[in-house]
Every structure is written in structure tokens, then in C-alpha cells.
Amino acid sequence: MAERANLVFHNKEIDGTGMKRLISRLIDHFGMGYTSHILDQLKTLGFHQATTTSISLGIEDLLTIPSKGWLVQDAEQQSFLLEKHYYYGAVHAVEKLRQSVEIWYATSEYLKQEMNSNFRITDPSNPVYLMSFSGARGNASQVHQLVGMRGLMSDPQGQMIDLPIQSNLREGLSLTEYIISCYGARKGVVDTAVRTADAGYLTRRLVEVVQHIIVRRRDCGTIRGISVSPQNGMTEKLFVQTLIGRVLADDIYIGSRCIAARNQDIGIGLVNRFITAFRAQPFRAQPIYIRTPFTCRSTSWICQLCYGRSPTHSDLVELGEAVGIIAGQSIGEPGTQLTLRTFHTGGVFTGGTADLVRSPSNGKIKFNENLVHPTRTRHGQPAFLCYIDLHVTIQSQDILYSVNIPSKSLILVQNDQYVKSEQVIAEIRAGTSTLHFKERVQKHIYSESDGEMHWSTDVYHAPEYQYGNLRRLPKTSHLWILSVSMCRSSIASFSLHKDQDQMNTYGKKDREILDYSTSDRIMSNGHWNFIYPSIFQDNSDLLAKKRRNRFVIPLQYHQEQEKELISCFGISIEIPLMGVLRRNTIFAYFDDPRYRKDKKGSGIVKFRYRTLEEEYRTRAEDSEEEYETLEDEYRTREDEYEYETLEESKYGILEDEYEYETLEDEYGSPENEYGNPENEYRTLEKDSEEEYGSPESKYRTQEDEYGTIEEDSEDEYGSPGESAEEKYGTLEEDSEEDSEDEYESPEEDSILKKEGLIEHRGTKEFSLKYQKEVDRFFFILQELHILPRSSSLKILDNSIIGVDTQLTKNTRSRLGGLVRVKRKKSHTELKIFSGDIHFPEEADKILGGCLIPPERQKKDSKESKKRKNWVYVQRKKILKSKEKYFVSVRPTVAYEMDEGRNLATLFPQDLLQEENNLQIRLVNFISHENSKLTQRIYHTNSQFVRTCLVVNWEQEEKEKAGASLVEVRANDLIRDFLRIELVKSTISYTRKRYDRTSAGPIPHNRLDRANINSFYSKAKIESLSQHPEAIGTLLNRNKEYHSLMILSASNCSRIGLFKNSKHPNAIKEWNPRIPIREIFGPLGAIVASISHFSSSYYLLTHNKILLKKYLFVDNLKQTFQVLQELKYSLIDENKRISNFDSNIMLDPFLLNCHFVHHDSWEETLAIIHLGQFICENVCLFKSHIKKSGQIFIVNMNSFVIRAAKPYLATTGATVNGHYGEILYKGDRLVTFIYEKSRSSDITQGLPKVEQIFEARSIDSLSPNLERRIEDWNERIPRILGVPWGFLIGAELTIAQSRISLVNKIQKVYRSQGVQIHNRHIEIIIRQVTSKVRVSEDGMSNVFSPGELIGLLRAERAGRALDESIYYRAILLGITRASLNTQSFISEASFQETARVLAKAALRGRIDWLKGLKENVVLGGIIPVGTGFQKFVHRSPQDKNLYFEIKKKNLFASEMRDFLFLHTELVSSDSDVTNNFYET
């Protein structure tokens, strides 16, 4: 009793580790038997307590954490911000992944801490808490997944899945989370089974390799050892673990006193003495040399001293112990156990977080900026790296705090920034090298959309290898994928494309372009337009060779009302032959799909076209030449399209008026046609003075082929136009439609039943009254059939038929009326004119081609009723007799039309010529769309209204406008754009090709106004002219590209710079903007919407792509923070940053300063320039930028961005592809190589252990090691000679690889908290590395080249023979090592039985049955077993050799030091391992 009273009473809980310690203490003190007795008592006690407590576990014991909701929300917010940064191109994919992992990891860890405290406070006796935290079952991580959050998963390859599982198992997972969980955590029964099988197979292979290793003798007499020293950063715990149970290889001295002798085994007492000695004199202490299985000299077994103490008791291992099998099982068994651990923890990612420095209080932070340099954190955020220790002061209101930041830390705040209390100001980089936990991983980034690849100037254009497409990035830069949609076109239409064709497509991307498909083609010298073939007809002469320098710019138009994707009309801008626009020239066509006739009625269009009064003549021969060449052009392409060529040119030039007339065929062009009148005209006089204030003018109609149609386009257009002084010309096109289509004429009900004669007096009167300001379009019904020549007609020419008469075998008429048949070369045209026929009495008094208005009463008819419709009177001759005329009265439909609109200042002039502003007027006219004359007809539509832009200007004197295509080049970037200028002098603009032609003087220091209607050309960036010199045009540039680029309107967004800028130089009167809505440009981009532009010039930098910093003028005294903390400042060419006075504007060309009045700027203006890439949401002006992209059109009050997706790529990343290459969605863009923390999960660990054992390790060697081996090869053979050099070289390699392999394997197990003694691993590694391969270069009589032999055997053979044997170290995997043993029976029982036995038989191998397995197979007695002491006689030769070495003291100690030196040399490599067993 008294004894018990003196005992110390410990009242504390005991967990797993405490129990382990207790048992090991008991064994040390009392031995095995007594310990097992005590443990039995413990077991009984435990069961008794557990039964009485009767802990049960129910689902309501799983208490969830209340704070989880907002923690998860916070993390989600952070990762959402991260997504946005990635989208803007601010961080790259790896940084995004890394940061998102850390965000969720930190959240998960924090939740884990919350969980512990939550349990402790709310329910300390909770069974889950008791169970997991006592170590009885489960651990904190598993409970965390039950009640906290499952967190991040890693997939079977060990890569992170960056979508975390936010739920816990108590709440239940959503479907997505469940799938990720199954995939990542590998929870299936199958998987556990497979893992267990893997672990079992690993155990089997390990045992197979080492089953024959037995402790056979006491001492092998080796003089080698491995040094262990705590100096190299080895932890004390590890140091103790390494030393205990080992045998010393050398005496240990402290000072002159020997404290331990060679061959003494190390116990706990000795280790403590070592540690105290090291602590007392850390630098003078010598390393401790110990013996390991690696140094044992025996080939097929191991000696007692090299193995050390037995793992079970504190004495040397007994002779006859099968240490090999023990080793194999010790390593394999934890694997089997650990596979089951995947049940909950499997796949959950764990990482580490850095130490943070936080601010002590609110205040302004200051540090010396010269001591830091800017860098980028691993999350892609800007930071400063300090080289040396940095003092940071934080100035609060009354106190000055000083914080010391260690070197190599990251400072996360700017100088002079205001920081809040507890804000993170720096991150301390961990001092220890975490190399071992990292692995290099490739991550591929794939393109998210089709596009064209661009990169900034930081990427080398030359690929790494000559023909490859891989490029290394020298520094961090952006890659941009400019949005583009690809158009794969059929072969026929592909021949039409030239370089820099610009097209519009909508609809499906991969649809082939049919002949009338929905895409405009615009070419640099031949221009094609397939959306509405009518444009093609009117511009067809652009194909002529003569018109080489015409250019067409179609402007896109987007209609919200219609259900089509985008219906667009092109505005085709033409520049005439000489580059001079006369007044009233049509230079643009405007095609509006809304005026298509939906119900396919046929008919003739008749319209009037008014022009200004001035008259222009041009040489008639010009026109004739054009048409001749045209004819050739068309005939060449007859296989694809059939055209009717121009039969004859008809022009009328009269004295004070001129007319536009089109030709009888389908392809008349109304633009600039002048010629001699060849027709007979009847004129109808009209008095127009009161309306126009102009002298009397006439308008004429051409006989016999026309009707007229009037169209009301006011409400369609939405804005009435003002009419200017105009006259009339006529323009006519035949309407040809295919007879196979069924047409219903919507106007059939409007045919008047009974009409009286129209007297000529009436016609003269009424024609004067309806000439209002609104022009009229008339649509006259007629039916047209185009029949093959061979078809037999059932009706006669000039006969009158009723509705639904049979015309040919299978066509019937839909209208009744007069039939006219016209036979042409390839086909027959059959026209049916509806209406009544009248035979007038006096033929001379009837005028053909009159329109009778509806209100007009017929003079000689008895009834006087109002007519509802206009009718059209047409005079016909009958059979060419002069007396007989008849008149057909045909019902027409009238449309009113909105007259031309004024597009003043579409092209503003330079400021000096501001008064000469060019007026562009809009005029609508009718054209008719024709089908192809082949059997396949894609669509036939009547096109009602075309709009023309007419150049006219207000001055009295007759001006000409110089229109030219301006080419501006800066640093080999060439841009073409249209420039229209009023020039007094007529300069011939047609020079030789590639000539720098003058386009009129550009005033000094003014921006070139030409960039207003610029259109984008591929791979060229527009820039402005740099010097006040003449700028010429470079036309007809031919380059071949392999593929077409189409930019649709959806890829572009427009940003307005100014809402309402007032400027002293601006034009005083503004014309209201014409609502042609936003007109989209050639690539679907908005080119200058037709409206006013202010004439001020803006800050534009030229030819400099700023990706990071944007400059802007700040005039409202507000600070717009553009990107990060860049306050208003300018950067000049030398990259100096100067603060900016808001009154100074920088002229980018001559760097002069202009002083601008303060009130002239109303909004902040960013300096933008063409080709600049802008990221989304950059605050350049009041409206944020909605999309990332490249600016490719800069207008006076807006600019257009081509949508682009930025990707950030860091140094060392590899770019796939070439600059400007077209990429498709899913193509590989960039390959990042980055280091990532290895997932420290045993389920990744086990395969890794297996990889190492199978010698499939992927880690590269340390560069230091290579250098050392080189030094070794230089010096050592000189000292020792070649044989020794080979021996020691192989030794060195093997020793090095052995040590690192042991460390790698230990690291995996230790990470799981599994303690395996190094000796077990060493025994197996010794077998894996004990072979060398005989190399080919030395001919040897003993071994054939390529043969695998044991290292010791090779050494002995080399010593025995005089000749040297050349061999190199080789690392076998455990499977190959099992198949390369000395016993073929053992090999055959492992794998490939037949092959192994057959080979052994052929070679006559002898099996000496030394191992366990072969004896088991053959049923013999196994040669192991402890408990017998057998004395082994040393052979006298061996003994003599040993003593001989002993006697040669000098050589022995030198040699021993040398061998120790080389192991130490290798092991002290700090990059690989500080010593052999460091983790």
C-alpha cells in the first residue's frame, strides 16, 4: 500500500501515440512476457468501460457547423472574382487553379478548426467527437467530411478538380458533387478491392525479391559506412530514429576521448550522449558512421552487424532470422491497411499555406522602393519582392509602427498605401525548400472559341525548332484569340476570294456558300456581293479590268424587327475611275431587304430619279470601252452564272438635263452613264418652277417596255427626308421570273373592270398636279415567263388572253391581258400585260407611258366615279402600221417614297477646309432582282427600293471631290481607307501601281481624317500618319491566304467616346443623326455611322500597343483609377511617366503641346489607338467596356472593338501555333509547366511507392550531382587508375540512388504517419540496386556484353583477373530483380513459368537451393531458423587479407576516409538530400 501511495497518479486521456509509447517503455523495462500480461489487463479494462458507457452513434450526433454558410459564401465570392480576373486575362490558368485550390483549402481548414471548437463547446461527450479524437476510429479529417465540408477532390491522376464539394456527407451531396466525389475520392467497392489487390501484389513482389536474404554470419568485415549528422538540417526525432538499433562502423571520439567503439550497437543512452555532444559543440562534432545493409559485403545474405538490432527486442538480430521476408511484409502491410483508409479521406486534397505578416494598426505604409522590385505572386497578383530584410513603417494618427519583413518575402501592398488593421501586408516565403513535395506538371490550355491568334511583342516569332510550331515565352505576356468565324466554301465560289476579302455570314458556320448564299464578298479589285444580286448587277462593272481602282465598302445593317439572324444591306461605296467624284455622282448603293416583295408577284418597276441641275459630261468612249470589257468578263464565267451581256448602250444627254437610263438587259448600272441618245423619246412637259425654283425641266419616259411603280417608304424608314432641287431621269429593269414558281399577284383585285378612253387633253393636265416633294414609285402588274427556246407556245404574240389560259404544255397564265412574246438567243420571254385595251380615235394625241392619278375623272365617260388606283397608259403600235394604235390601260400600285436625306459631313474635312463640307444625299430608287437563267433557282425576289448616296455639296461653283484610297504605313503596318477630299486642282490619281500617289495635301499637325471610314484588313493595324507628307494609296495588293475570315456583328461591340462634346472648333449646326440605326461595317463592325462628327482631334497614340497602362486626360478633377493605381499621367516614348496638367493636350505626332480651353472637355478621354487590346471592364470612360477585344476602328465619337479572349501565359510556357493562325475551338493554345504540391494522399502515395520500387521514378537528378560526377570522372581515375575508377564510379552511382530511393519511399509513408524502419527499405533497395550491366566497350572473356551480374561478383572477378571489366550500374525494378535471381525455381514460381524453365534448361542452369522459396516449392527443409549458434570459420586467405589491410594502416585509413568521403560527398548535396535519411 505504501508503495502505491508513492506512485505518481496521471489523470489524463491516453490516445494511440501515448499507447505506443507506453508499450515500448514496458518492453524496454520488463521484456515481452510481462508486457503482454499488462496489455491483457488494459484490454479488459477498456472493454469493461466501453460496455458500461454503451456509446452509440446516431445520425443526430453529427452536429453541423453554424458558421459554414457564410464561410462558403465568402469563398464563392472570392472564386467568382478569380473567374473574372481569368476572363479578363489578368491571371493565367495555373494561377487560377492554384488560387482556387488555396481559397477552398483555407475555407476547409478553417471549418475543421471551427468543428473542433464547436464540438468541444457544445457537446464534449458527443460520441463522434469521443470516437475520432481519442483515436479509436476515424480521424478529424473524416469527421470534418461528415459534418464540415468535403472540400477539394483530386482525380485518379492526382490532379486537382477545381470544383470543390461544398456539402458534407451529413447534408448529402448534390448530383454534380456526388459524381465528383465518386470520381475524385474513389469510393467504390471496386476501387477499394483494386487498391487492396494492388497492395497485396506489391507485398508479393517485395517478398519475392528478398526471400533469400537471411542473417548468416556475424560480421562481413566491411570497412564502409554511411555518415549521419544532425548538422545537415535533420530533425532530432529523425536523427534518433535513424541511429537506434544500428551498429557503428567507426569509433566515435569527442575531443580525444572515445565514447563509442566500432561494431557497437547504438541504444537510447548512446544516442542521448551523441545529442548532448552535438548540442554542446555543433560545429566540431564529427559525423557518425553507421553500418547498413547497403555496406554489407556478402552477396546473397546479410551479416548481423550490418543489419543491427532486431525490430522486436533490443538486442542484435539472431543468426538464421529471415530478415528479407520480414522487410517485405513490413513495407507491404501498411499499404494493405492504408488502402482502407481511402474510405473517407480518399482524394481529399491537402496543401499548405504561407506565413502572413499583418498590419498592426490602421495607417499609411511606407518602405524604401529601391530595395524591392515588382514581381507577380503565384496567384497572379502584383507584389514586391524584397531581397534583404526590409523595414516597413506604418504611420497611424499618433504612433509610428515599424515592422521588419525578412528577405525573400512578398510585399502585397503599394508604397504610401493606406492599410487597415490586421490587413495582410506581406507573405513570408518558407525558408525550407519544399522541393520534395512538388512535382512538375504540364497543363494544357485549350481555346474556348474559334479565332485568330495574336500575341504581344514579347513572344519570339521564330519557333524553337526549325519546322515546329512551339515557342517558348521569354517573359509573361498575353495571347489573344481574336474572334472569327470560319467559312469553308465550295470550290466554285472559293475561286472568287482574294486576300483580305471581307464577308458577312450569318446562319450556320459551316454551311457552304451557295451562289446566292447570304454572304457579301468584297474583293480588293473585283467586288462581289451575293446577298442581293441586284447589288451585284449594279456594281458589276467593278469587275471590269479598267475599274481596277474601285473599292467597295459595304456597311452592315442590323434589324431587330425581323426574325432573321441578321439581315443586312450593303452600302457599296465606289470610287470612280479617275478617282474624282463629280457633283451628284452616285457613289454608294444601299440595299434594303425590307422592301422585298414577299408575295412573289411579277411586274415591271418604273421609277423616277432626280438629280441636281448642273450638268456633267464625260467622254462617251470611256463608257463604251467599259462595256466591251464587261462583256468579256461575263462570258468567261458562263459555266457558273449566266449573264446577259449588255446589248447596247443607251444614253441620253440633253442640254440642261441628263438622264440615267438603264439598258434593256438585266445588268444596267445606273452610275455615271453618259452616252448619246439612241432612242426616241416623248417628253411630257411639266411646270416645276413653283416647287423647285428652277427653270422648266422635262422628264422623259422610255416607251414600250416600262411600267412605273410608286412606293411609300416614309414609315418604313422612320424619318422623312428633305427634298432638294432635283430633276428626273428614268431607269428601267426587266423583271424576269421563272415560270415554274407559282406567283399570286396581290394586286389582282385592283384591276379596274371598265375604263373609258383617256383623252390626251386630260393627260396633259393631270400630270402637273402630282409632282409633289415626295417621289413616287409605281408597280405595274405583269406576268413574265422565261421559257426554253424549244418550247412550243399555245398562244400568239399580241393576242389577248384570259386568266388561267394554257401557255405551254405545263404552264398556265395567272393574269389575263395582252401577250407579248420576245424570242432571244437562249430562251423565249413571254410577257402578259394585264389591263384593258382601248383603241383611241386620234393616235397622235395619246401619249404613251402616262400615269393617271386615282382622283381624276374621265371626261367622256358617263359615270363619274373616283378611281381607287393609279392606272398606267401605254401606247402600242399594232403590226407597225402607223395608223393603228391601241392603248393598254394597266392597273398600278403606287408607293410613296421618302426623298433623299442629307448626310452632311460624312467625311469631315481637315480643319482648314471645314467650310467645304461634303454633303452626302440619300436617294432611293428601285431595282429589280433577277434569278439565274438556269434550272436551279435559289430565290427570286422583287427588290423594291435601293438607296443611293449621292455626292453633292452646297457651293455655287462646280467642285470636284478627290476620292482616293489612302494607305498609311507606320513601321510596316499598312492600312487602306477611303478618303474623300475637296480638291481645287485636278490631279490625276491614276499612277502606276505601287506608286505613292498624292491624295491632296494633309495639313501640318492635323490628324489624317481618313480613318473615319476605315475598314479592317487582315493582319494589318491602322495607324495615323506621322509626318505632314502626302499619303498615297497602294492598291491591288495580292497576297494569298489559305482560309477566309468572317467577323460577324456579334463579335464586335461599339463604345461611344463622347455623349455630348462641345468644342470651340466644332461645326456650329448639327444635322440630326439619320436613324439608319447602327450601320455595321465590312466585318460586321460598325463603321462610321452616317452622322455628324465633331471636327476636333483626339489624343491618339500611334503604333504602340499598350497592354498594361492606359493614359487619359483628367479634366473633371476626379480620379479615375485605370487599372492599378495609375493616376493621371502620360508616358512618353522613353517610358518616363510625367504627371499631367489637365490643360495640356499632347500632340502625338510632333510631341508639341497644345493648350486647350478647360471647358472644352466634358468627359475623361482615354488615349486609345488602333490595334490596342483592351480588357473587359477597364474604366476608360464612363461606360465600362463590355467585352475584351482589339480596337480596330477608331471613329471620331466611338470606336469598335473586335471581340477577343485574352489568355495570360507565363515565362517558360510553350505556345502552340503561329502568329495570325486560325484556331478552332478546342485547339491547344498554351502548355504551362508548373510545379504543384503533390497530393499527400496515400492513394497517390502507394502507386508512387510502387513506381520507385519498380524503378520508374520520374524525378530528374539534381544538377549538383551531375557536376560532382564529372569532377569525380576527371580526378579519380587519375589517382586510382581505371579499374578502381570503374569500381568506385559504379559504387558512387549505386550509393547515391540507394539513398535517394530510401528517402522517397519513407516520405510517402511518413506522410501517412506510418513508421517503417529504414532497414527494411534498405534491404529491398539493396536487392534492386545490386546488379551491374557489363558494357560493350571492354571485351571480356568472363562475361558477355549486356549480362547482368552482381556488383560484388564483378569486383571479385575484376580482382581475380588481370584484365579490367567494364560495367555500369543499373537500377532494376522489383519485378525484374525477382526474375534475375540465382535460383530459377524461385523465378519460375513468380512469373512466366514456362519461359524461365525453358531458358534454364537450355542454359543448363544449376539451382543451389539457397533461398526459402525454392525449398518450399521442392518440399525441402528451409535453410532458416533462429536459436542455433553456428560458428563460421574464416578461411585463412580471407583472414590474411583482412589483417594485411589492417597492417597497411596508412592505406587503410586513407581508403576508408575516401570511401566515407564519397558517401558523404554525395549525401551532403543540399538540393537532393542533406543526408541519407532526411525527408
Curated annotation (Swiss-Prot):
Gene3D superfamilies: 1.10.132.30, 1.10.150.390, 1.10.1790.20, RNA polymerase Rpb1, domain 3
Pfam families with a match to the protein in the record: RNA_pol_Rpb1_4, RNA_pol_Rpb1_5
Stretches with biased composition (Acidic residues): 622-631, 704-717, 731-749
Main location: plastid
One cellular component term from this protein's GO annotations in UniProt: mitochondrion
Cofactor(s) required, per the database record: Zn(2+)
NCBIfam families assigned to the protein according to its UniProt record, in alphabetical order: rpoC2_cyan
Protein name: DNA-directed RNA polymerase subunit beta''
The gene coding this protein: rpoC2
